[in-house]
A protein has these predicted regions:
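Transmembrane alpha-helices of multi-pass small-molecule transport proteins
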Residues: 12-13, 37-86, 167-172, 190-206
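Glycine-/small-residue-enriched transmembrane alpha-helix faces in small-molecule transporters
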Residues: 1-43, 151-178, 297-300
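Membrane-interface helix-cap regions at the ends of transmembrane helices
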Residues: 2-7, 52-72, 139-152, 195-215, ...
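Loop-to-transmembrane-helix transition segments
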Residues: 12-20, 60, 65-90, 156-165, ...
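C-terminal transmembrane-helix exit sites in multi-pass transporters
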Residues: 91-96, 110-135, 254-274
Length: 300
């Protein structure tokens, strides 16, 4: 018995995508709040992975479907889990140096990078309009960062960490689309937590900062949000195209900006807003183009 219907409608998959990206905003908010405590990034990531794996294991036990957590292609899942580990560490680092709004604007390069990866490795082709949209998107990143100005909303450590996040997430998204043909979404999420926790606790053997009950509670909530977001994301990717999922990535800008203002009273500057508009427009065009291609392919 499968834990989810074998076929989920596009609307249902989109609902899971929206839920997943929202839970990830809450995860990132928790990470940014925890980052103010000075905990090492690897220690935060270790507990993130541990709590995420625990929640998913309890989920499998409650449904009597522990077998869906087991990987079928261990080596491939291990590689994908390492990508998640690197992504999570860089998210922690980036959020210590950037506002939530600027962080999401920069990570919105991911759908554009996915389009480039698909053209190079999957030979999907890159029409000139799509190429122009990608160039416009990267121009938006330059505008948002505005290196020519002195008053910026981040620093180069945050920008570099975001670059690694984008690379890991983009490869992971394409890879996950392939893996979900044989693997359960729960298995991908669970194994990611295991790999992340194992690597994080191994690094903690060298140095671990002391924890308080409050910090443990915050990391517990962080792990819960991440588990829910990751599970929803993989369910969405399994039941609809990557293009459908990636275009809803941009809802994080709305929720992230709102949360950033409510908690830290951060207001995005003019260059950040202009860059965000360029990235948003180019990303939505790329996603819409990919969706049209997918629809035509299915119609044939």
């Amino acid at each position: 018995m499968r834990p989810f219907p074998a076929v989920l409608s596009d609307l249902g998959a989109i609902g899971f995508a929206l839920a997943g990206f929202t839970f990830w905003v809450l995860t990132d908010t928790s990470i940014k709040l925890l980052g103010q405590s000075g905990l090492p990034a690897y220690e935060m990531v270790a507990f993130l992975g541990m709590f995420m794996a625990i929640f998913l294991a309890l989920y499998g036990l409650a449904r009597g479907q522990v077998q869906v957590l087991l990987p079928k292609r261990l080596s491939l899942q291990l590689g994908r889990g390492c990508l998640d580990m690197a992504n999570n560490v860089c998210v922690v680092i980036a959020l210590r140096h950037l506002t939530l709004t600027l962080f999401y604007i920069l990570v919105f390069m991911a759908p554009l990078v996915i389009a480039l990866l698909s053209a190079v490795f999957l030979h999907e082709g890159l029409p000139w309009r799509k190429g122009a949209a990608i160039v416009a998107g990267f121009a938006g990143v330059v505008v948002a960062v505005h290196p020519w100005g002195s008053a910026r909303e981040g620093d180069w450590i945050g920008y570099a960490a975001c670059g690694v996040c984008v690379a890991c997430f983009s490869v992971n998204m394409v890879w996950s689309r392939v893996l979900t043909r044989t693997e359960y979404p729960e298995s991908l999420a669970f194994f990611s937590g295991i790999v992340t926790a194992a690597a994080g606790f191994a690094l903690m053997a060298g140095h671990a900062a002391p924890l308080t009950p409050l910090l443990l509670g915050e990391m517990f909530v962080m792990g819960l949000f991440c588990a829910l977001g990751t599970l929803c994301f993989y369910i969405a990717v399994k039941h609809t195209s990557a293009a459908n999922v990636s275009q809803y990535h941009y809802t994080q800008l709305i929720t992230g900006t709102l949360v950033s203002y409510l908690i830290w009273r951060n207001k995005p500057g003019l260059f950040v807003l202009l860059g965000g508009v360029l990235i948003l427009a180019s990303g939505l065009y790329v996603a819409a183009s990919a969706r049209e291609v997918a629809t035509l392919t299915e119609g044939n």
